[in-house]
């Protein structure tokens, strides 16, 4: 909170604590306000507590994290994004890992656990090809620790749903993903495919 108008926060509060420190790509981050008024963050494992309700501890496995700013209610969310978190014009949230350029949520954990007979084991899925099935055409020689990664996404990040209209109607429903190792940005057109995208 800026109390004296100098555009610098004078009051800082920790809202949540307990996230497990790990590699940079496995840190809580990339907050995005969803159309449902929850704030979504990538990858928040740990034993999480809230400063507003310190008696409530939630153990979050290797998943994304979300909270309601008004009540500070918080919970695990489907997905395990790393560097990138975006919401398209229809409210679909997309995120990525280094080898999975565009992922989204099919069902939230709370919905899946209500039915003990559910055959769905994870609530997120790849919107397009992932891992060794992706193809990128870099402008430079891509260096990788694994030969099988050549010509594929190895460091996907910054997933962004294009919401503007400046580029023209052909860019509606486009999702861009950075691939820094190959010095390029990939573009995918996301469209409904039955119950999924």
Go through each PLM region and give its residues.
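Beta-propeller domains with acidic blade repeats across secreted/periplasmic ectodomains
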Residues: 1-197
